[in-house]
């Protein structure tokens, strides 16, 4: 009887622990202008949750991949990107839910950056760069366009790449630039092409940061004289506040191990961001608070996906006796026989394996 009670207690503790853990890898959190609600992407759909935490409400249910929610200034609409028509397009949906409206129809990739006002969305795309541009027309160096929330023909807003745009009530624009092809998820990057923050005010561009590493993701503070942003100046991405006139920084967070991503701010100064797969809020001078979120939804993804691929190997190495071939697929190492239909997976890691070669005896691999 005691063993039965103990087993039941352990089971209950285990279930409670799992419930407390909550969902992980919720991405692109965006806090509403009034600071009451957070929109985020999870497993290809959009959700909304109270800023203090609780049960998340599913906003989109399409089988396609929906991501990168952006709030309108009045908090009534959310723009997002989705590949439900093949390529990534910009859509807008009521915060109450319902059927979204498709705003872009180009065959390329369009992602929303900000609302210019309640009725116009700014988005990045490669549609019609001007002949005067000295930038190569590539996806990595997209332009910025604006489109009505009712749809219609897009209008060129900026030929320069402008990412993570934040517009205050005076019409001043903050953004971070893009100078090269470096992966946006790379950490500890220092080079001449790292991102810097700029301000566009009445047609004049002003560079606001000069750190040799990454400065990115600016959002206006409530006073319109300073802004919050992410920087790696202390070794990991943390939140800073910078006064534009003095250039003085105030560090808001002190994370050391993992980077902070996806910074947004409400009109009342509540900051929201992603950290280590979860969502946090913080006010200047306070301590970060994890937003405890529960999601109740059907599991529409199979636990195991069988894929047969005849292409996509990034590297290949032939054994000394020519009876085996090693190759890299999706970052992992595989070995296949040249005489039989046998393929064996050698590695299963979240890291990327590369530079394959067989040992002289053909019995081991170096990578």
Residue map of PLM features:
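Positively charged n-region of N-terminal signal peptides that target proteins for export
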Residues: 1-4
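Hydrophobic h-region of N-terminal signal peptides that target proteins for export
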Residues: 9-18
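A flexible loop/linker signature enriched in serine peptidases of the S9 family
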Residues: 20-23, 41-47, 55, 60-66, ...
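Short N-terminal segments immediately surrounding and downstream of signal-peptide cleavage
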Residues: 21-35
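Conserved beta-strand position repeated across blades of beta-propeller domains
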Residues: 30, 70, 114, 166, ...
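Residue-level detector of Asp-centered blade-edge/turn motifs that repeat once per structural unit
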Residues: 33-34, 73-74, 116-117, 168-170, ...
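Acidic/charged, solvent-exposed loop-and-adjacent secondary-structure segments enriched in E/D, K/R, S/T
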Residues: 290
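Glycine-rich phosphate/pyrophosphate-binding loop
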Residues: 307, 312-318
């Amino acid at each position: 009887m005691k063993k039965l009670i103990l087993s039941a207690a352990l089971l209950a503790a285990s279930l409670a622990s799992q419930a407390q853990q909550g969902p992980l890898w919720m991405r692109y959190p965006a806090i509403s202008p009034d600071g009451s609600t957070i929109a985020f992407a999870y497993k290809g759909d959009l959700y909304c949750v109270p800023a203090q935490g609780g049960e998340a409400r599913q906003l989109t249910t399409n089988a396609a991949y929906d991501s990168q929610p952006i709030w309108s200034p009045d908090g009534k609409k959310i723009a997002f990107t989705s590949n439900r028509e093949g390529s990534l397009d910009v859509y807008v949906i009521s915060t109450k839910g319902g059927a979204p409206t498709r705003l872009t129809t180009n065959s390329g990739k369009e992602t929303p950056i900000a609302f210019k006002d309640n009725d116009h969305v700014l988005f990045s795309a490669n549609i019609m760069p001007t002949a005067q541009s000295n930038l190569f027309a590539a996806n990595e160096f997209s332009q910025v366009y604006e489109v009505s929330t009712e749809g219609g023909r897009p209008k060129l807003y900026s030929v320069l790449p402008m990412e993570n745009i934040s517009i205050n009530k005076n019409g001043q624009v903050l953004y971070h630039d893009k100078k090269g092809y470096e992966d946006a998820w790379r950490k500890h990057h220092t080079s001449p092409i790292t991102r810097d923050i700029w301000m566009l005010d009445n047609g004049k561009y002003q560079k606001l940061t000069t750190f040799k590493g990454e400065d990115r993701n600016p959002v206006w503070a409530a006073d319109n004289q300073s802004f919050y942003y992410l920087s790696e100046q202390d070794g990991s991405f943390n939140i800073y506040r910078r006064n534009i006139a003095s250039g003085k920084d105030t560090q808001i967070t002190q994370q050391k191990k993992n980077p902070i991503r996806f910074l947004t701010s409400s009109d009342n100064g509540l900051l929201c961001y992603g950290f280590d797969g979860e969502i946090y809020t913080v006010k200047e001078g306070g301590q970060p608070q994890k937003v405890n979120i529960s999601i109740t939804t059907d599991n529409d993804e199979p636990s195991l996906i069988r894929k047969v691929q005849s292409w996509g190997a990034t590297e290949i190495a032939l054994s000394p006796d020519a009876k085996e071939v090693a190759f890299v697929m999706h970052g992992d190492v595989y070995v296949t026989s040249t005489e039989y239909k046998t393929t064996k997976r050698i590695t299963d890691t979240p890291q990327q394996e590369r530079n394959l070669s067989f040992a002289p005896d053909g019995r081991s691999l170096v990578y």
